[in-house]
Amino acid sequence: KAAVLAMVDLPTGAGMLVGTRTLASALKYLILMVIAGMLMYLGYVLADIYRPGELPGRIPLARFILALLTAGFALRLALIPFHAWLPDLVEDAAPMVSALIIAIINTTSLLVLVLSFQRFPVLLVENPLGPTLLRIGALVTCLIGGLAALQQENMRRTLAYLLIYNTGMVFYGLASISVTGLTGALFEAMNQVVLVVLLF
């Protein structure tokens, strides 16, 4: 991300080094990831301060914390409707950059999400509507990602929407709050890493 900021500060004529579309995609990615990081950080701070589940009257705060974490991770993982950065990034960036972001950073984010739900299980357990909404969001991501992939003419954008579809399937497994769902989600996440490395 620091490299993106360094490119912004390059002298006149730097446009010959980096294309305008590539720079725009990089800046979009940088800004959205900073916003995602702030949402997740705020969610973790509130979860650590208020310890949801320890006091009986704090369920609304647990819902707010879950909403913050969900929005942050949805932005980070390019779930619908926070997906706009991924097709642009895959289309405009170098293949190895796309592979690094999708295979390493997004998969690591999924593992952090699993650890977050393990550390604060009350966010899901004492909030019966939360997992249902997460599963609905994951299904919407799968549906829209798959349909959008069918409509693309650019192969790289098609791949990006298929990755969004796949991430929705992984997120559904995580939101199912079951050993089978979690195992399937982690297996599919590792499958996505192998697929991305082979494709790029």
Question: How would you label these PLM feature ranges?
Answer:
Residues 1-200:
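Alpha-helical transmembrane segments of multi-pass membrane proteins predominantly involved
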